[in-house]
Amino acid sequence: MASSSILIPPILTRRNLLLSTTIATVTPPPPAKPPSPDITITDRVFLDFSLCPTYFRSDPSATLSSTTPCSDSTPLGRVVLGLYGRHVPITVSTFKRMCTSSSTSYKNTPVHKIFPGQYFLAGRQGGGRRDTAEVGYSLRDLPRNTDVVNSKAFLLPHARAGVVSLCLSENDDDDDIRLDPDYRNVEFLITTGPGPSPQLDGGNIVFGTVLEGLDVVTSISSIPTYKPSENIKQFNDFAEFLGDERAQNARSLWNRPLKTVFISGCGELKVTNPSLSPTLP
């Protein structure tokens, strides 16, 4: 006759009970998820883009904001931007001012670089003259942007087309301008898609989104740009290794549009209830 095995239940002593209770008590709860950035749209601005068949080279004594730099321009369309004023208030305030100021503004300044399938850059600072076609270097009255030292300002990703971001890692203002104690960064980028641009994440501050005119953004991204050959790139790398300053000057021409695209108008759009949450993904 086969012997049957008998299972003896474990003896729960007072010591084991106390130990298990203590372990359950000191086990830390899972860390709380940090709150998501507030991307409520607090303001709306517009940028009108136009195409000029020639470069801004005539009458270099006139400032960009005083006259129209291109008499035979072709309108490309209007882009309406929603701005995240609760997320990065100083960045948004500065951008709004650059869109509405009657003196120094984005008006009549170019899209100076285009990276197809990724983004384009605008708002580069220069002499504010037609021969440079850049934002005038007179921004000392703008507030210092403390958003750039707030780690939370860098949390939003460049995950789709139509993301508006303050250029930091991609900023290409001249070094002598950036080293000025009164320097104010107003250069911005807009992602063009079709996919995300993760290389921009963590190094630039997302402060808005395209609400209308994404087709205009797409048309700008399709404009041909200057692309150096591989031989030129290798020669440039070697020149930079030798410390030749001309290498950096030459690289500033890369990815420049072969047709002049400029911001022909800009301003703020007043709405009855501007505090909206974006519906874009």
Swiss-Prot record:
UniProt enzyme class: isomerase
Localisation: Plastid, Chloroplast
Pfam families xref list: Pro_isomerase
GO molecular function terms listed in the Swiss-Prot or TrEMBL record: peptidyl-prolyl cis-trans isomerase activity
Tissue: Ubiquitous. Not detected in roots.
Chemical reaction(s) catalysed: [protein]-peptidylproline (omega=180) = [protein]-peptidylproline (omega=0)
Keyword Chaperone recorded: yes
Presence of the UniProt keyword Endoplasmic reticulum in the record: no
Inducers of expression: Down-regulated by dark and high CO(2) treatment.
Family: Belongs to the cyclophilin-type PPIase family.
Name of the protein in question: Peptidyl-prolyl cis-trans isomerase CYP28, chloroplastic
Organism for this UniProt entry: Arabidopsis thaliana
Gene name of this polypeptide: CYP28
